[in-house]
Amino acid sequence: MKIKTFGLLMIILLSGCSSLQFNQNQTHTIIDWVDFVKLNGNMYTSDWGIVLKHENDVAEEVGEVSFTVDEVVTDPGYRTKDGDAAFLDIGTKLYRVKGFGTDELIAVADDTRVNGYKLYIQDQFRSSMINRYDEIPKDKVNSIGLYCDNESKPYKTLTGKDINKFIKLLDDGVYSPNYSPNMNNGDPLYYLMVFYTDDPIGNSFSIADDSQNVYFYPDSTRIVDSEIRDWIEQ
C-alpha cells in the first residue's frame, strides 16, 4: 500500500494530474504528504539540511498559504494549486530570501528552526544546493553553530582555529554503516551542527551521542573520536 501511495503522491506533486478514474463508492486514500508549498506554479519542499544564516536575510512577503491539504484531501487525483501546502496553516506568510529568487527558495517563520525560519527549496533548484557533508567548501567556513534539537539559537559558536580542529575530528571519523546506537541509557542526545560561509544560508547536519559513541551521518554513519564531546557538550 505504501508503494502505491508514494507513486500516487509523485503523480500529484510532479505532474499535478492523474488519469485514474474513481467511482463514488471507492474508499478514499490516506495520502502521506511531503512537506510542500506551491507558489507561482512552482513546487517547494522543506529541507532540514539548509538553514537561514541571519534573520534579517528574510526579505519581502511573496505570498501566503490559502489551503492545507493534509487530512483534508483524500483524492489521489487532486491537482495542487498555488497557495496549497501540506502542513502549513492557512494564512502562513511566505517570504523571499535575500540572494535568491522566489523561484529558487522561500522562507516561513518557525521558532523551532535555526534563526526562526524554515526554508523551502524549489524542486528543480534543489540539485544546485549542497546536500552532502563532503560537498561543503570547508576552507570557506567562517563559523560553526551548535544547536540543541528544535532550538533557534546556538548554545555554542565555533570560530577561528576551533573550526579546523572540529572539522578534522569529523573528517577523521570511521565509517560504520551497520552501527546500531546504544540504547541502554535511553535515547541518544541529538545536536545540530551548522556550517556557515559568507552565503545567506548554512548547511546543517545532526550529530548524536549515545553515551558509547558520538556519530553523525555525512552519507552513512561515521563514528567520531570521543574528544569531540569537549566541543558539543553544553
Give names to the regions the model predicted:
Residues 1-7:
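Positively charged n-region of N-terminal signal peptides that target proteins for export
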Residues 18-234:
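Function-determining sites in protein domains
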